[in-house]
């Protein structure tokens, strides 16, 4: 399964959240990531709260593309409460 993203959306995400989607993609490989559905949208979207390879705790929003690839939509640094939730889940 490949992870893809729109280059324009990646540039916007970097401007708005200072998070590179290429680095954020590694959250999806975190075996301890907390995954959940994001019901706030018309299309099925999912959230992953986890760590990048560099140890940065992020929230990544993604969807499944028609060809089964994952399409990253956005990523941002986790809030204090989200970081706490991730740390507690790791115990």
Language-model features, listed with the residues they occupy:
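Ribonuclease/tRNase effector modules and their secretory precursors
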Residues: 1-91
């Amino acid at each position: 399964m490949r992870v893809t993203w729109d280059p324009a959306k990646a540039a916007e995400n970097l401007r708005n959240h200072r998070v590179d989607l290429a680095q954020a993609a590694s959250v999806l490989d975190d075996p301890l990531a907390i995954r959940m559905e994001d019901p706030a949208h018309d299309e099925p979207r999912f959230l992953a709260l986890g760590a990048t390879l560099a140890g940065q705790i992020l929230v990544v929003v993604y969807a499944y593309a028609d060809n089964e690839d994952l399409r990253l939509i956005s990523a941002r640094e986790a809030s204090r409460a989200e970081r706490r939730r991730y740390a507690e889940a790791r115990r």
